[in-house]
């Protein structure tokens, strides 16, 4: 049996070819060491459902859920290094966005805005926003009621579509 492999965190349509190439390289390396590996990635599975599946071979998670609920159940084998601006070495970057016609010039202008976040256990998609807002909040509510979207792209779509600010 070759197991389940999923790289869903950043498997956006524009990156699909690169994600497949990454998996192909990983699968070839695994097979060269005698480990079975699926030909293709599982894209139609709920990421939360695969973490305790005995067939899980390889998957990608955000660091926050790894440290808070997955550590001890799965083994960390690598941390990707991306070449996006602000992501040099071990660093990563989160973007806080508003609609193109929004007058906000900075985060301090966003008091009362309704955020769209990936999930409450996402470092880049939730906790980074909390950390950025904390100094502005001064112990009082700063942002309005937000929504959880499940993915970075879905959060951007929620802002663009008006479901969030």
Describe these PLM feature segments:
Residues 1-73, 79-83, 87-91:
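N-terminal hydrophobic or amphipathic helices and topogenic motifs
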Residues 35-36, 73-74, 112, 142-143:
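A generic structural signal for alpha->beta connector loops
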Residues 5-25, 89-157:
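Bilobed "Venus flytrap"/periplasmic-binding protein-like clamshell domains
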Residues 52-59, 113-114, 160-165:
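Alpha-to-beta junction loops
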Residues 45-50, 152-158, 164:
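Short, hydrophobic alpha-helical packing/hinge segments within bilobed ligand-binding/sensory domains
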Residues 75-76, 133:
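Glycine-rich, phosphate-binding/catalytic loops in enzymes
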């Amino acid at each position: 049996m070759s197991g389940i492999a999923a790289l869903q965190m950043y498997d956006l349509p524009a990156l699909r070819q690169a994600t497949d190439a990454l998996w192909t390289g990983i699968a070839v390396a695994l097979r060269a060491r005698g480990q079975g590996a699926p030909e293709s990635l599982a894209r139609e599975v709920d990421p939360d459902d695969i973490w305790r599946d005995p067939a899980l071979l390889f998957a990608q998670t955000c660091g926050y859920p790894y440290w808070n609920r997955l550590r001890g159940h799965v083994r960390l084998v690598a941390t990707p290094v991306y070449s996006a601006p602000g992501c040099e070495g071990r660093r990563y970057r989160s973007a806080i966005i508003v609609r193109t016609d929004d007058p906000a010039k900075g985060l301090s202008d966003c008091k009362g805005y309704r955020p769209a976040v990936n999930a409450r256990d996402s470092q880049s998609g939730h906790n980074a926003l909390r950390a950025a807002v904390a100094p502005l909040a001064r112990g009082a509510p700063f942002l309005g009621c937000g929504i959880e979207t499940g993915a970075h792209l879905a959060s951007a779509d929620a802002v663009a579509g008006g479901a969030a600010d």
